């Protein structure tokens, strides 16, 4: 089972935040007040948030298919995530209350894990060359790509390489962008 836990960097007891499983942590709001995560409830994986101190979980998405990889934008205005709601894994964003869901990528790649630059103008993501459905396995042909937030244009940062699960699951920007 997968739950989300919290502990102090100084040590001490570990506190469980989520009461249902599976729950997969992905991000913390810029003000540290909320966590955002992917969880399976009622047979579907959707995006949830809750207070960083625990409490009631708030469902932010409810689409058929996998919603995963949620991450707050540095300005705290949006939550970016990947979704299979169109039949292809693409990058989406929504306001932090779950409203105004907007598709950000529209290509034939399977796009995962958008990580927003500190200046909120672009995002790096991993793209599988061949459609992987609702999976993000390791050991596949992938590229790192850059999404322009304003124009929604995506450009290659790398040529294809052997990677996948674990390549860029967490935020990896330099604080200066």
Predicted features and spans:
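Conserved beta-propeller blade repeats
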Residues: 1, 19-38, 64-82, 108-123, ...
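Beta-propeller blade-edge and WD-like acidic-aromatic loop motif
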Residues: 1-16, 34, 38-59, 77-78, ...
